[in-house]
Amino acid sequence: MEDYDYLVMLEDDIIVSDSYFLYTKQAIETYEQYPEIVGISLYRFHVYPQNGRFFEPEYNGSDTYLMQVAQSWGQVWTKRMWNEFHEWYLSHQEFEKPFRMADYSYSWDQRSWLRYFTGFVTSENKYLVHPYHAYSTNTQEIGENYKAAGTDFQVCLAKGQKEFRMYAPEHCVHYDAFFEREPDEQFCFEYQGERVLMDLNAARSNYGYYRYLASTNKLNFHVIRTYGLRLRPQEINLTNDIPGKEIYLYDLTAVEKNSLPSNKEQVTRYNVRATSWARLSYLGMKELTEKVGTDIRKKLKKKK
């Protein structure tokens, strides 16, 4: 990066929008001055990669929001942003998983720059700028990362020229590395005056020092009350006090058996949207058949 003021990184299976450069230019001009910003994403996530949960960030009028998530499907850095990461990396080539870092990110190969960048972002409480509309997309072609072609991470590209509205960080919507909402100007969910940790994607394994947890995961802690999953994005079901039994509000200091009925059917319906159960059954059987076939072929190969 020493020879360049900024860098746009694109892998060979990435397609960019015709307005990606305009977005990149204005994002750099807007966010370079803020030390908490250490990257700019061209890609717009629509699912949480760890478990495929649907992701829709709350919109507040800005063309950008902030998230503690880096990715390799269209990423921008300025010299200042990259050098800050590189300096951290030189002294953290071995590092313990930060509380804010997802298990699946920490488990990536140690040759992955993304593993270290995620460690940097989550340990130093930094953020990346993300667009509400995508300026790059992943064609998900067969290669090192994908054994079969797919469309899971393909997104619709934004087209046309426009003047972007990009809010300062303190006015943006915030999400963490688990794609969970953080307190900001538009959102704050507390219980008895204490912040509630969000786990609506059911991906956390460590709850840190928090006493209260809102999760769609059925856990053996005392359930204070439950909420429904009716509105989008999912976190506003809490602030709007939506009735239902899909989200559990836990007191983590009280361990006890959760005897409430399973919420898996309702949570699945919420995340798959209009897909019919017949189609889901077909896909499930097809994937199971392919996996069994792969396992059999591996065993036969070993015998030879």
What are these regions (language model features)?
Residues 1-9, 14-304:
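Peripheral/terminal regions associated with large enzymatic or DNA-binding modules
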